[in-house]
Amino acid sequence: MEVSKRIILVSGMSGAGKSTATRILEDMGYHIIDNYPVVLVDQFVDMIEVSTDPRYSYIALSTSAEDFPIFSRKLNGINASVSVLFIDASDSVLLNRYKST
């Protein structure tokens, strides 16, 4: 079974840098899907499995830390190379970022 699709599941704490990471991935040619509704994850998986659209060959799916386990479980075992990029930051860094906004 040849894997031709790559999915990076980007998750982490709010304010840790997910948006920065997805911008970099977009510059690398990934199609970015941000805050995809978790209730539609089954439809997303079905679409990815059958799609021949080249835009869906490289996908970065950004999700909240709360929804991460659901997406991770649903993406496990599909015909794609799935990687996880979990971004974290210390409490002091997160507090400083929130103070500056």
Predicted segments, located by residue:
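Post-Walker A alpha-helix
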Residues: 21-22
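Hydrophobic anchor at the beta1->P-loop junction of P-loop NTPases
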Residues: 10
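Conserved nucleotide-sensing/catalytic segment adjacent to the nucleotide-binding pocket
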Residues: 32-79
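Conserved phosphate-donor/acceptor-positioning beta-strand/loop module used by diverse small-molecule
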Residues: 80-101
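Walker A (P-loop) ATP-phosphate-binding motif of ABC ATPase nucleotide-binding domains
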Residues: 7
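Phosphate-binding P-loop
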Residues: 1-4
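Conserved glycine(s) of the Walker
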Residues: 16-17
